[in-house]
Amino acid sequence: MNRSAYRYISGRVLYHLRTEGVDWFREFRPHISGNSFWSLGGFNESYYVHIDSHFAFENGAEIHLPGWNLTGEGLDAPFQIRDEGDLPDGGRGPIIIPVGTYNNQELLFVANTNRSAPLSVSAGVTFGDFYSGTRSSPYGSVSYRFRDRLTTSVSMNYFDVKLDEGSFTTSLVRLTGSYSFTPRIYLQANLQYNDDSKNLGSNIRLGWLDTAGTGLFIVYNDTEFLGDIDPLGFRSGPRQRQLVIKYTKLFNLRG
């Protein structure tokens, strides 16, 4: 969220506890972090406190539990969180959260296998209070790496939100990949689909590196609307297509 004219405070405390006498367990990392934003008039716009414990195993796997988040959102104007959702009266329409201060709590659990292995899996879930209601958001990802040339990953996030003003669900699916032809030439791709907006976005980048991060970069961006009619009344089809070619060169002017 972009902010202007605000006061801000943040902090973090982390402790590493090694267990030398246990072969299969590496370390325990309890920690707490947080931040808070105020307007110049003293209104608390938001705060976030995160309390968690990470259990790191010798085989590279980790478990984070139980994470506990304390969150707060201050709204000095109504906030439309959804263009269309299920309203309490059984109809469909925009979901608008009224003015107020919302203090919430949520729990989270995260686990992953060894991320440096050729094949790794990550999964987690967050659930708890959200504005005037509740939210649950499980997610998962699978990553594959072949030597130092190929890396791929597929992930999915799901959000189930139930508020006094209405309810909705959203899914986000993402596929990423990177292939290195040589240490200086690579191809990267990022595909993302949001079932809320019905948009399929893609970003493809070809890089041919020179010294100090310079070189040739070719980037193609594309957004396709896969629904019937979007909120502006347009039918399915392309929404954005962009091709960017950039070349930079570093010169030594001192001879």
Annotated model-derived regions:
Residues 1-255:
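Exposed, low-structure sequence patches enriched in small/polar residues
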